């Protein structure tokens, strides 16, 4: 699954993000919905405003083994029918493989940054 990279990330963070993504056989692409301002609405935005390095990344909309457009259609369906509604919960048919990959990715990027003496 591709990852989405927000342009506000610092250079060393971006370098580590690309390294780990490549090791996982993944690609990093720009935010597919920048008009929604996800980075600016995030919990870590106040830290980033004050110069604290912030990793802003998330799962994309392309899925391995699915046709182009499948992920966007599912995302649009979820947003229209479930997002911030009583039905907004984990569904039994959700494939969490990408979420596991994301957790491994974030951990490894964070670990490598923690081992670095510069930002």
Where are these regions (language model features)?
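Metal-dependent peptidase/peptidase-like ectodomains
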Residues: 1-80
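His/Asp/Glu-rich mid-to-C-terminal helical/loop segments that flank catalytic regions of hydrolases
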Residues: 58-119
């Amino acid at each position: 699954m591709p990852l989405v990279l927000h342009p506000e990330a610092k250079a060393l963070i971006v370098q580590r993000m690309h390294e780990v993504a490549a090791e996982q056989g993944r690609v990093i692409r720009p935010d597919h919905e920048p008009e929604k301002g996800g980075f600016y609405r995030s919990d870590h935005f106040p830290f980033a405003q004050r110069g604290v390095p912030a990793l802003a990344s998330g799962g994309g909309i392309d899925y391995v083994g699915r046709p182009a457009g499948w992920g966007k259609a599912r995302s649009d369906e979820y947003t229209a029918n479930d997002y911030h509604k009583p039905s907004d919960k984990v569904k039994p048919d959700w494939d969490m493989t990408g979420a596991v990959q994301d957790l491994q990715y974030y951990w490894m990027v964070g670990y490598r940054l923690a081992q670095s003496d510069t930002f």
